């Protein structure tokens, strides 16, 4: 996932809710 919000199912703060 790509983004800046900790949303999307991943635990990293670099994940986005897009994926």
Swiss-Prot record:
One of its GO terms (biological process) is blood coagulation. Conversion of fibrinogen to fibrin is triggered by thrombin, which cleaves fibrinopeptides A and B from alpha and beta chains, and thus exposes the N-terminal polymerization sites responsible for the formation of the soft clot. The soft clot is converted into the hard clot by factor XIIIA which catalyzes the epsilon-(gamma-glutamyl)lysine cross-linking between gamma chains (stronger) and between alpha chains (weaker) of different monomers. It is found in: Secreted. Its main location: secreted. Keywords: Adaptive immunity, Blood coagulation, Coiled coil, Disulfide bond, Hemostasis, Immunity, Innate immunity, Secreted. GO terms for cellular component: extracellular region. Heterohexamer; disulfide linked. Contains 2 sets of 3 non-identical chains (alpha, beta and gamma). The 2 heterotrimers are in head to head conformation with the N-termini in a small central domain. A long coiled coil structure formed by 3 polypeptide chains connects the central nodule to the C-terminal domains (distal nodules). The long C-terminal ends of the alpha chains fold back, contributing a fourth strand to the coiled coil structure. Cleaved by the protease thrombin to yield monomers which, together with fibrinogen beta (FGB) and fibrinogen gamma (FGG), polymerize to form an insoluble fibrin matrix. Fibrin has a major function in hemostasis as one of the primary components of blood clots. In addition, functions during the early stages of wound repair to stabilize the lesion and guide cell migration during re-epithelialization. Was originally thought to be essential for platelet aggregation, based on in vitro studies using anticoagulated blood. This is Fibrinogen alpha chain. It comes from Antilocapra americana (Pronghorn). The lineage of its organism: Eukaryota, Metazoa, Chordata, Craniata, Vertebrata.
